[in-house]
Amino acid sequence: MIKVTIPANYLLALQHLAPKKEVRYYLNGVAIIAKSGKISLVATDGKVMGCLSKTDYEGKDFSCILSNETLKSLSIFKGKEVDFVLHDGADGFVLKGIANGLVFDAIDGKFPDFERVLHGYNHAYNGQAAQLDIELLSKFTSVAKTLGNTKFAGNWRLLHNGASNSVGVYKSDATETGEWVWYGVIMPLRA
């Protein structure tokens, strides 16, 4: 049995970075990945990626992807601090919150190796500026607002790494408690 508690607004925030109708169907949602004592919530559309993770997970390793449809049913909790418990049941995964459990089948597919793409805070960035798509950057503002960080939603630290490498997108106060750590990247515009 898998049991992990996840704030609803974290899943809804990351949904802003997930595509709506991607041919690579396994990207159409938010991945929950537990590996080696760390649990990560990840979403990407191939141009932007965001991850909230924490390192005090003590359960078994697992991976599942919540579809956009499943996340849509959680939207009634937007703006509320509601924790859900994820169980691996006989009928699929079950999210249990204040209401009855939402039973869903995880998307059948393997989420890309996001750790290969995300840079840690200590990564050596070269500082060379890159041109960025303002619409893609605005997705991070939507993420911050959904996380409840409305006052400084547009304040993100961009760590440039040249015109052909991903740019780190960081916000040290992305979550109120600091229990979950934010990592993000955005790809620069191609000339």
Q: What residues fall within each predicted segment?
A:
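DNA polymerase processivity clamps
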Residues: M1-A191
